[in-house]
């Protein structure tokens, strides 16, 4: 097995130079980099991660806790994180928790044992139990990427769900809709509570009376959207528009309503939330609230790198602002 000395000898440079090229820890002339990397390829040299971590006190690995990586919103954020990890020479360890505390606890312990340089947390709800578990590992830099209370030991990115809920509802109202239903995720989720607050604020500003029976609880997946569509279609006095708290439910709702013979948006308008890639290509293309998912991933990784370099820095909170994306699923009725 080739060693760093073999690489240095073949490239005609010092072992220190080889180390800087491989670890990207100092500027090295491009011609020298090419010689070193050519020698690395010829010798099939692979640096020892264990030796490097002992010497540099870093493993160049990042852990990421997510509720479910197959969720289209999460997957686009993860893609952004992974891309920037790769560019910076970091390895990403992805931990799917399913929202189960025992898995969250075990993964955090495993990441601590692996001496990861930092942890990104993107769970569908940051419970008090999970917050306490994260705070027990205060020595590991962390960024909380979405919902839940602000951890005393972590930086946080806030998605401003209340603002997004307000924007979606106001757009429906501006297009003449007063009979508006909303399909939420689980009511106890912080993001859902905030989006409902935004929904209610827009309705109150427009002096529109709320029908609490039209605030439906889902689970951010298609199955509950199908059940909600069946319920809405069965009502004699139906809403003219539905605000869905994510695009997955919006697309599921639209599909089922169309199966039941209701046209979108002629018979009922729909607005979603997240602006996942699929939303643009559905028929009709979905009007929605955009969250900058890949930028969230990039910013979270950059913030975490800053925290890794300066663990004593004051805790930071960064805000992201949702934006309306107008497509073809909202009918103007005034």
Curated annotation (Swiss-Prot):
UniProt KW keywords: DNA-binding, Purine biosynthesis, Repressor, Transcription, Transcription regulation
Signal peptide: none
SMART domains found in the cross-reference section: HTH_LACI
InterPro entries, per database record: HTH_LacI, LacI/GalR-like_sensor, Lambda_DNA-bd_dom_sf, Peripla_BP_I, Tscrpt_reg_HTH_PurR
MF annotations from Gene Ontology: DNA-binding transcription factor activity; transcription cis-regulatory region binding
Disulfide bonds: none
Pathway(s) per entry: Purine metabolism; purine nucleotide biosynthesis [regulation]
DNA-binding annotation, residue ranges on this chain: 4-23, 48-56
Domain HTH lacI-type: 2-56
Manganese recorded as keyword: no
Sites where the protein binds hypoxanthine: 73, 189, 220, 274
Recorded superkingdom: Bacteria
Record-linked Pfam families: LacI (PF00356), Peripla_BP_3 (PF13377)
Presence of the UniProt keyword DNA-binding in the record: yes
GO biological process: negative regulation of DNA-templated transcription; purine nucleotide biosynthetic process
Domain notes: Consists of two structural and functional domains: an N-terminal DNA-binding domain, approximately the first 60 residues, and a larger C-terminal domain, approximately 280 residues, which imparts the function of corepressor binding and oligomerization.
SUBUNIT field: Homodimer.
Functional summary from the UniProt entry: Is the main repressor of the genes involved in the de novo synthesis of purine nucleotides, regulating purB, purC, purEK, purF, purHD, purL, purMN and guaBA expression. PurR is allosterically activated to bind its cognate DNA by binding the purine corepressors, hypoxanthine or guanine, thereby effecting transcription repression.
Protein name: HTH-type transcriptional repressor PurR
Species annotation: Vibrio vulnificus (strain YJ016)
